[in-house]
Amino acid sequence: MIFPIRCFSCGNVISEVYDEYKTRLSNVESPEEILNDLGVTKYCCRRMFASHRLENGKELFDDIVEYR
């Protein structure tokens, strides 16, 4: 699905760092290190990144659009 703008639990804006997270993740950096550097410290916000499906640079939304 499309990455959410805000954390579902606390309401912090998390979408502003998603592009940086996605870029650095494709460069084979550790998700823990990336989130620490980006200042995402709350567990609920970190969960939003960890649970978002991202394989080979493609999101779930990209797969769904193919069958439209």
UniProtKB/Swiss-Prot annotation:
Q: Name one GO molecular function term.
A: DNA-directed RNA polymerase activity
Biological process (GO) annotations held by this record are: DNA-templated transcription
Species per Swiss-Prot/TrEMBL record: Methanococcus vannielii (strain ATCC 35089 / DSM 1224 / JCM 13029 / OCM 148 / SB)
Localization annotation: Cytoplasm
EC numbers on record? 2.7.7.6
Its recorded name reads DNA-directed RNA polymerase subunit Rpo10
Q: Which UniProt keywords apply?
A: Cytoplasm, DNA-directed RNA polymerase, Metal-binding, Nucleotidyltransferase, Transcription, Transferase, Zinc
SUPFAM superfamilies on file: RNA polymerase subunit RPB10
